[in-house]
Amino acid sequence: MLKIYNSLKREKQVFTPIEPNKVRMYVCGMTVYDYCHLGHARVMVVFDMVYRWLKASGYDVTYVRNITDIDDKIIKRAIENGETIQQLTNRFIAFMHEDADALGVQRPDYEPRATEYVPEMLDLIGKLEANGLAYQASDGDVNYAVRKFPGYGKLSGKSLDDLRAGERVEVDSAKQDPLDFVLWKHAKPGEPAWQSPWGDGRPGWHIECSAMSSKLLGQHFDIHGGGQDLQFPHHENEIAQSEGANCCNFVNYWMHNGFVRVDNEKMSKSLGNFFTIRTVLEQFDAEVVRFFILRAHYRSPLNYSDAHLDDARRSLDSLYFALRDVPPAAADIDWSNEFAGRFAAALNEDFDSHGAIAVLFELAAEVNRQKSAGLSCLLKGLGGVIGLLEREPSAYLQGGAGVGGLDEAAVGQMIVDRAAAKKAKNFAEADRIRDELKAAGIILDDSPQGTTWRRA
């Protein structure tokens, strides 16, 4: 029985889909004007794990993760670069896909771009206006009248009075209330614009997700996810828009992953501790990064540091050592097995990947103790459920080697030379070769079956 922590209700709830055995899930994706950073990596990996587990549990899942390809930052960056918005966004969408693929993130079923759904946005704004929840201001913008929606604040737990008193609200004399937010921005010279009943302009950020989700998943669907930073105001505003326009419940379960911190500080460009996925992957294997993200519960803060990534690498290495030393015939899962049952129980408890990975370590210990190929198959199979342990052990353990200028063939030849030196009892030469390989970031493992190597 799957339980999900529902941010809307502030408690874990048994998951009951709207339609039996079908799940419709929407996750807020990237704004594509720059490279993806570690915060994006966490969103991608966490909800990929959710997607995988829902499918493994037998659900027919429709997963939508949007792309924001029009907003102020995109326009500003395109102007700075002297290129079109399409050139900029297409380039960074391609980079985003490269990063996601490296991290083992499966493509969503739908990946809508905001600019492709402007008619749906206009339709939604029209409904809001007809329902008395939207108005055109003197500056030409169309705004949402927040105080006219009775349920505003139910996701974030913020009252309108608290927001007015405690939040930094942008002062805009054209708004009826400082808390109102823009649905349609009046066109400015040199900016992209679409025709609308309220004049040429472009959509506000919040209306984009309401329109895309309702078009692809319907007005009422099961799960909406995203980073904790989006809970307010973005997701709060989505609820106001969607429920205000369609007069029905919007989403049953809201999921939010925790923040990423760097050495216990908030990650930000101003602090100089801002890391893109690409920067991290120059130093660490992509599966290590995925493992690092999943080793923490998705709602917990995730503290990035080189030391924590090194520890994650050593931990993942140990799982691959078990698969290397007791090769599985194939990935196979017997769900009646005790380890498989506890693995499933962890993921059914609000997608507790931390607990599931703990079961993998217990299973690996049994693989090592019993030398059981059957348990090795189970280890590989369970790891694959959450996108881990899907490579050949040698490919993983030798990945990243060559930092000292040695390719795979050169390493193989040096191992042959070392074996010959040992056979000739030239132990000084054998030790010299081992030390040279170690200096190049390569560790040798001797066993009765021969010598294998891995990166340090």
From Swiss-Prot:
Any Gene Ontology biological process: cysteinyl-tRNA aminoacylation
Protein residues bound to Zn(2+): C28, C209, H234, E238
Catalytic activity annotation: tRNA(Cys) + L-cysteine + ATP = L-cysteinyl-tRNA(Cys) + AMP + diphosphate
Motif residue range(s): 'HIGH' region: 30-40
EC number: 6.1.1.16
Keyword presence, Translocase: no
Name by which UniProt lists this protein: Cysteine--tRNA ligase
Species the sequence originates in: Dechloromonas aromatica (strain RCB)
Gene symbol of the encoding locus: cysS
